[in-house]
Amino acid sequence: MALDATQKEKLAALLAQEHVAVLVTQGDKWPTANLQAFAETPEFDLLFIMGGNADKYQNLLKHPEATVLVDNRDVGKIPTFEIVRAWMQGIASDVARGSAEWESLKAIFLKKNPFEEPFFKNDGLRMIRIRPSRVSYASGLRDTFKAEL
């Protein structure tokens, strides 16, 4: 089932509101979860930057399947679980540094996260684009949906 217009709006609103997500990658033995800044494209592709020597980057090169969790627990009502959250699963790909795609996605990333600008001066910086294929969304306990993208 694909996302309908209302579901797209809900997912887009959550992604636009949040600046950090939990990126889960599969290592040789253990999964690894990292909280870090992200940005999203209008098509819901998720963008992350990281060092080329980071475990998460190396994990994604070997095992490109990734899960990303985005939520608003910082402003949600924890006692009643009124938290908007979504996990997205997809395939990660490396964005070639210096390419037109890199420059285009860098602009999207920095528009959302201008505080990340200094990292782009590091020659070891890498950018990953995750093209989601599945999403599970919930706002509280009743407003939920799952979809294939």
Spans of features found by a protein language model:
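Structured helix-beta-strand junction loops
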Residues: 17-18, 63, 133
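Short beta-strand segments
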Residues: 18-52, 60, 68-72, 79-80
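Short acidic (Asp/Glu) patches
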Residues: 51-54, 69-75, 106-116
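Short helix-to-loop capping/linker segments positioned immediately adjacent to catalytic or ligand/cofactor-binding
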Residues: 22-26, 76, 114-122
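A short, polar/proline- and glycine-enriched secondary-structure boundary/capping micro-motif
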Residues: 57-63, 80, 147-149
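Charged, gly/pro-rich active-site loop segments
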Residues: 2, 81-149
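Extreme N-terminal tail/first-helix region
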Residues: 1-21
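Charged, amphipathic alpha-helical segments
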Residues: 4-9, 56, 111-114
